[in-house]
UniProtKB/Swiss-Prot annotation:
Quaternary structure annotation from Swiss-Prot or TrEMBL: Homodimer.
UniProt-listed Enzyme Commission number(s): 2.6.1.1
GO molecular function, one term: L-aspartate:2-oxoglutarate aminotransferase activity
Catalytic activities: L-aspartate + 2-oxoglutarate = oxaloacetate + L-glutamate
Positions of post-translational N6-(pyridoxal phosphate)lysine modification: 284
Principal subcellular localization: mitochondrion
Superkingdom of origin: Eukaryota
Species per Swiss-Prot/TrEMBL record: Schizosaccharomyces pombe (strain 972 / ATCC 24843) (Fission yeast)
CDD domains: AAT_like
Keywords: Aminotransferase, Mitochondrion, Pyridoxal phosphate, Transferase, Transit peptide
Gene3D superfamilies: Aspartate Aminotransferase, domain 1 (3.90.1150.10), Type I PLP-dependent aspartate aminotransferase-like (Major domain) (3.40.640.10)
GO CC field: mitochondrial matrix; mitochondrion
Name of the protein described by the UniProt record: Aspartate aminotransferase, mitochondrial
């Protein structure tokens, strides 16, 4: 109403209202807008996200041979985003149901939670379901945020140990929740493999009852996973020290193509009565990156304790985002609960996993056999999943970007999904050039 009245005023009359216009009881000082607000003057400029920064640099590069090996999203052999046919089919079938857009419960769609946790825990599920608390989350990061806030509120220890190195956002999520973040040894640069002795030593040295974050499969960023025997040793150390296991499983099925194999650690811990919680994501194995479908689950001692944990989880989620989005969870639930679609999806996951394995083999073969590079590249095929820790140093990474228009993180991590039959030789030749000097 005021806006309409002001537009009807003569310009000279409007000009006289410089400092005393009142709108809905709030005095508007026109002269103050000229001075600007000083309340945010001390907010420092934050550093750009390293992964999204790589993507921006890639987009600005006009070279036809440019490569983006930083982003953790799957690409097909043509370098294009890949929407799984099973996901397309699920969307079509869901659309025909004309579902509403009402709020989901605070902990999400119940059937999705059941299907997600069954996928994760497998044969162990039936023995733990009565004391398992679950909540649909905003993908894996959302599950980690629920976990971080719950542990900060209710777990005695306020220190969490993460692998060195770990996913870049882990430290941010847990420190923002008020937890102290420390690290344990994980990657051995000399062997480009797992430093199991250092890891077990650090877990033993940590105070009893510490929170230990473990990558369930396809370790990010190294691609280095423990063997089953090493997982057994890790479990024994965790039990001896009464540590709390926080398992981050973002790549089930996507790592090896085998859902059970990728969930080995999760099921081992769940069946061994170790205090634990699990964070799941369907971003990678269903390609639901923008749909943000995930699941948080935590094991209680009994059903009564589970009820109390669930009540606090609901309060926590209500404060964070109230209710999770429904579309991604509906897609995932539809696939998981439909035998034919589930079988189709499983085959597509195997296909994605096999393509990544083939790119690892091709890269190694070109470097070692075709180019006769003086270094060993065995670690490329020893590692697993979407990422590979190449061993390239920051200086070599800079040369790759400036001279070859190839973009990856400073620590030498590459996303294998960025490689395809058209560009893998170019990348190998670039690596050969920067490592031969």
């Amino acid at each position: 109403m005021l806006a309409r009245n002001l537009r009807c005023l003569h310009p000279n009359t409007f000009a006289s209202l410089k400092t005393n216009v009142s709108y809905h009881g709030v005095k508007c000082l026109a002269s103050q807008s000229k001075r600007g607000f000083k309340v945010w003057a001390d907010v420092p400029m934050g550093p750009p996200d390293p992964i999204f920064g790589i993507t921006e640099a890639y987009k600005k590069d006009g070279d036809v041979k440019k490569m983006n090996l930083g982003a953790g999203t799957y690409r097909d052999d043509a370098g294009k985003p890949y929407v799984l046919p099973s996901v397309r089919q699920a969307e079509t079938e869901l659309l025909s149901q004309k579902l509403d857009k009402e709020y989901a419960p605070i902990t999400g769609i119940p059937s999705f939670r059941v299907q997600a946790t069954k996928l994760a825990y497998g044969d162990v599920y039936e023995s733990i379901k009565d004391r398992l608390v679950s909540a649909q989350s905003i993908s894996g990061t959302g599950a980690l945020c629920i976990a971080a806030n719950f542990l900060a509120s209710f777990y005695p220890s306020k220190t969490i140990y993460v692998s060195d190195p770990t996913w870049g956002n882990h430290k941010n999520v847990f420190s923002r929740a008020g937890l102290t973040v420390k690290s344990y040894k994980y990657y051995d640069p000399a062997t480009r493999g797992l430093d199991i002795k250092g890891m077990l030593s650090d877990l033993t040295s940590a105070p009893d009852g510490s929170i230990i974050l473990l990558h369930a499969c396809a370790h990010n960023p190294t691609g280095v996973d423990p063997t089953k025997a090493q997982w057994d040793d890790i479990l024994k150390t965790m039990q001896k020290k009464n540590h709390f296991a926080l398992l981050d499983m973002a790549y089930q099925g996507f790592a090896s193509g085998d859902f059970a194999r990728d969930a080995y650690a999760t099921r081992l811990f769940a069946s061994s009565n170790v205090p634990m919680l699990l964070c799941q994501s369907f971003a990678k194995n269903m390609g639901l990156y923008g749909e943000r479908a995930g699941c948080f689950s935590i094991l209680a001692n009994d059903a009564e304790e589970a009820a109390r944990i669930e009540s606090q989880t609901k309060i926590l989620i209500r404060a964070l985002y109230s209710n999770p989005p429904v579309n991604g969870a509906r897609i995932a639930n539809h696939i998981l609960s439909n035998p034919a679609l589930r079988e189709q999806w499983a085959g597509e996951v195997v296909g994605m996993s096999e393509r990544l394995k083939s790119m690892r083999k091709a890269l190694r073969n070109i470097l070692e056999k075709d180019l006769k590079n003086k270094h060993s590249w065995k670690h490329i095929t020893d590692q697993i999943g979407m990422f590979c820790y190449t061993g390239l140093n920051p200086q070599q990474v800079d040369v790759l970007a400036k001279q070859y228009h190839i973009y990856l993180t400073k620590n030498g991590r590459i996303s294998i999904s960025g490689l395809n039959t058209s560009n893998v030789r170019y990348f190998a030749e670039a690596i050969n050039a920067v490592t031969s000097n």
